[in-house]
Amino acid sequence: MALPAIHNWEPYEDSLIRIKHSCFAMHELYRERYLLARTRMMYYDVPIIVLSSVSSVFIAGGDAYMSKSMVQILTCIMSLCVGIIGSLKKFFRVDENREQCLETYKDLFRMFCELAIVMDMPSTSRPGDPQQYSTETSSKYAEIMQRSLVLEGQRTKYNPIYDDHNPLPPEKKKSILSRTRSTKLSSGEITPV
């Protein structure tokens, strides 16, 4: 009776570990971004709540204390402010961005946990075909990152997914970065020093 063939995970371990570390690093960044976005919601929601409440009070009983035209002017101005704040919130897609960060954070954390469980097992007891698992995992990671928001900042440049055995030669990297900088200069995104 022949024993089942043991799959060789070694060729796939490096890329799977990089994806695992990237999931961890990026889930932390998206978590921070989500918490920041949730805090920023306060700057939109609190003024809307306060102005709407004060406006309702003025409409209900403000004419007992001031002229009707003054009450109308004040409620009109407050309603205008509520509308402007609500429009800015919608324009900047505050709710959508917050939800997208939360979804990406959860997806990356879930993927990190799945990878950690599989990669911490001895290679002889890992389930399934390593090539298929690696392909599915890479596709899933790429899909999550394509759906995600683009984050800004220095920390995003140090994503472990970029730490491979075949890095870009320094001159090629410099060429790409200088083209990116010249494009930003010509579009007015940054100013030369």
Curated annotation (Swiss-Prot):
Residues 162-174 have a biased composition (Basic and acidic residues). This is Uncharacterized protein VP11. Residues 177-193 have a biased composition (Polar residues). Residues 158-193 are annotated as: Disordered. It comes from the Viruses.
